[in-house]
Amino acid sequence: MLLDKTIRENLDGKYLTIYGESFREGIEYAADIDIPQIQLRNNTKCNSIDFKELEKIPALKVISFVGNTTEIINLDSIYSLKDIQKIYFQQKQKFKIDISKFPNIKHIGAEYWKGLDCFNKAYGLKSIVFSKFSGLDLKQ
């Protein structure tokens, strides 16, 4: 798939949609235009995506995962995004993510899954919206 350079807008501002097949090119373009928000779309058509590329956009404020993002290399590189304020997951993911490692996180919106870890230790959170949360205790 060719790189989609269309700049869209939602309630969080302008964003770039990056597809798994053009992940590296999309991140480079996001860095070039200094966009504050990206939306990562399902990468089932590509072998893997390397989250080390995210280090090229350290000022990112909002990241959204649309679809199930699989085959991730260097997952820990996502924690280099120290300015992230909002994270959205449209559906359960196959990776584990420690929300408390984002020092400026303010909001999470997600379909809950057990890999969504330590959100109860992310003390800067102002709001959490979970769908399909079957537990009774957010401390689990």
Task: List each model region and its residues.
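Concave beta-strand-loop units of leucine-rich repeat
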Residues: 2-28, 34-55, 59-97, 101-140
